[in-house]
């Protein structure tokens, strides 16, 4: 009788251990997916900062009058759907210097939209015909995580007075 009770307890412990192993494996996969998502978001944020720094570092607006290396002028359309874009050197710019843990370098596209404030009102609300008007840019970035299957796309608008 003791042998039967011992075997039943052993079978129950084995089933419990297998269920715990399955749960631990699932939690490990979820933690890996979360880490991968965080990496891709950090890569996209890095690309966004670099693209905005690129815009800010320009002293003349004329660099945005041509298209190439991730820059699109007003007349040239960037890829309509960033999800299906190739994100290669023909339509975007890669961030120099690799980030740790990501499989592909983050990339960005900058589209020059237009000058805002076409009227003679300035930010302060006072009329001034000679006030410089800011130019608005649409910045689209892509970051990947530990695998190319995990991507994050961000889009922002940035303005600068030249």
Regions found by a protein language model. Name each.
Residues 1-6, 10-162:
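Terminal alpha-helical segments
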